């Protein structure tokens, strides 16, 4: 049984806890009325009073809690439209947007960012004449028993944050909106609730305050917080569907069997079984959605992400790289391609970049990445037959300057034969392979990588056969691994058609650190996140008595390039791949 590290998920404030605030003392001044009494006594605030009453906030303005209210005068806003809104919308987007806890008088020079009841941050400023979020104050400082009342010449604009904007209908984004909001939950806030008696061993509450949280925000980005600053790439419904169709094909999970230490001799090999709980379908759905979201969130305060705000304002400064909230990077070409196909929309806590009919993210960036296998890592090497392995180190200082190329991670594995007639076998795990088509490459290291004095006649190529052990589509294991072949073009006929040959034995160029293509391989099932994996078998194929090839094999690494990336790199030779 394999356990999945399921995403831990959390929660944004839902019920007002008004009664938990209390004004320490009445505001000094000659006024003896509450804010509510002052509002209802002013005929120019009758529309605002009616909306406050409808939303259920009159009691707050009558209470001893200290608040400041910016009340729009009659006919300076669309009263009828607001009266037709639901109480929930009216409370959050209008009434709470005009009330703040504590006293905020207009006196002298003022420049204050104020957190309103709905947690939106609005700027109150001026010196003699005052504005609230750009709206002129008509009459400041109507002193009241429980705070301050300012009248203003218009409604304060409600600015949605990114999470709230996933609810609106300005764009066709129902798919991602429905998915994100399916993780909205309520949680009791014990510290803000009033404890009651213990009943049947359980603590009850006289006054329960709940917080509403979105469980995805904890794991990806706090797009629900007003004090945060994020960018979110928001796929349209069409873009979401296209991307999810692609992703789900790459994460085709089934129950399967695998060998823990694969080798042709089966020296220490045992067969194990992976059974997915609760089901393979659950894994396909949950992992696919996770991969879909991974590349959509960016903290605007980090690194070159800061330039996203300039993109939102219509500028397009070059971006060296963007870093997601999962610390994955995408670089200049890919980042700018993604952004240029979007419509930026500024929000109270960042920016939404809404896509058109496609999410212009290259699939190998987040969904179907390169699989890199460092040969010198002991955890990657499953088994060696007919020889012994050792890890070698090479740095820029120790590398032979006459050998072009470089060794990744400053290390490689050397496998030496047991006898001068042995052909060695190396078996490697291909962990994390997706259910997709790859082009497999191997990087060979020459014998003189750190020794420039090795005689030239002793620097020979390897000749190897390459096999892949993988499952069938139903998860069963075939009797034998698949032998890879590569189709090479060796010329052209009189009509210009290519003449090809099939290569099943691969050789390297020993004059350099050489990357060799072994051909394509398609995995029917996905191994991402699994204990078991397919394996790569490299078999030295040097005939008896042959002196042309080296029986000692030196491997830097192997990498599986998604077929689309391999083709893209051939069409765009200047494209930079980071792996």
Regions found by a protein language model. Give the residues of each.
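Mature, structured domains of secreted/extracytosolic soluble proteins
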Residues: 14-579
């Amino acid at each position: 049984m394999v356990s999945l590290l399921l995403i831990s998920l959390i929660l944004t404030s839902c019920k007002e806890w008004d009664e938990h605030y209390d004004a320490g003392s009445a505001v000094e001044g000659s006024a003896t009325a509450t804010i509510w009494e002052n509002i209802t006594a002013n005929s120019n605030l009758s529309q605002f009073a009616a909306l406050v009453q409808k939303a259920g906030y009159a009691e707050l303005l009558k209470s001893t809690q200290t608040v400041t209210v910016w009340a729009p005068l009659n006919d300076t806003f669309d009263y009828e439209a607001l009266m037709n809104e639901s109480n929930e919308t009216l409370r959050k987007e209008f009434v709470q947007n005009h009330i703040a806890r504590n006293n905020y008088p207009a006196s002298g020079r003022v420049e204050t960012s104020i957190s309103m009841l709905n947690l939106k941050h609005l700027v109150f400023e001026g010196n003699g004449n005052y504005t609230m979020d750009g709206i002129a104050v008509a009459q400041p400082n109507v002193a009241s028993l429980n705070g301050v009342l300012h009248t203003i010449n218009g409604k304060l604009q409600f600015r949605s944050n990114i999470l709230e904007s996933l609810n609106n209908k300005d764009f066709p984004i129902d798919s991602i909106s429905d998915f994100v909001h399916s993780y909205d939950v309520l949680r009791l806030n014990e510290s803000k609730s009033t404890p009651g008696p213990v009943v049947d061993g359980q603590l009850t509450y006289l006054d329960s305050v709940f917080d509403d949280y979105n469980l995805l925000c904890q794991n990806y980005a706090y797009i629900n917080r007003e004090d945060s600053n994020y960018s979110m790439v928001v796929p349209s419904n069409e873009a979401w569907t296209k991307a999810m169709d692609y992703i789900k094909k790459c994460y085709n999970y089934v129950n399967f069997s695998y060998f823990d230490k694969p080798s042709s001799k089966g020296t220490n090999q045992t067969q194990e079984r992976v059974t997915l709980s609760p089901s393979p379908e659950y894994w396909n759905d949950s992992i696919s959605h996770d991969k879909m979201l991974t590349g959509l969130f960016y903290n605007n305060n980090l690194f070159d992400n800061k330039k996203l705000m300039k993109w939102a304002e219509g500028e397009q400064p070059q971006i060296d790289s963007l870093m997601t909230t999962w610390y994955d990077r995408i670089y200049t070409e890919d980042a700018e391609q993604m952004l240029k196909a979007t419509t930026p929309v500024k929000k109270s806590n960042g920016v939404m970049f809404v896509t058109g009919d496609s999410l212009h993210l290259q699939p190998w960036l987040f969904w179907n990445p390169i699989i890199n296998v460092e040969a010198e890592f002991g955890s990657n090497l499953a088994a060696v037959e007919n020889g012994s392995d050792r890890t070698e180190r090479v740095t820029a200082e120790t590398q032979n300057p006459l050998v072009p190329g470089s060794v990744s991670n400053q290390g490689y594995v050397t496998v030496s034969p047991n006898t001068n007639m042995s052909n060695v076998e190396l078996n490697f795990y291909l962990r994390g392979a997706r259910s997709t088509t790859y082009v497999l490459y191997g990087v060979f290291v020459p014998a003189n990588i750190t020794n420039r004095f090795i005689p030239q006649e002793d620097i020979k190529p390897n000749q190897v056969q390459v096999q892949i052990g993988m499952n069938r589509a139903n998860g069963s294991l075939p009797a034998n691994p698949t032998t890879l072949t590569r189709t090479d073009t060796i010329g052209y006929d009189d009509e210009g058609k290519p003449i090809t040959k099939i290569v099943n034995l691969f050789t390297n160029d020993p004059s350099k650190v050489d990357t060799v293509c072994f051909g394509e391989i398609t995995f029917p099932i996905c191994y991402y996140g699994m204990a078991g994996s397919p394996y790569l078998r490299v078999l030295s194929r040097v005939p008896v008595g042959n002196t042309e090839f080296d029986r000692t094999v030196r491997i830097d690494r192997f990498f599986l390039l998604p077929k689309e990336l391999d083709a893209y790199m051939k069409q765009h030779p200047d494209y930079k791949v980071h792996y």
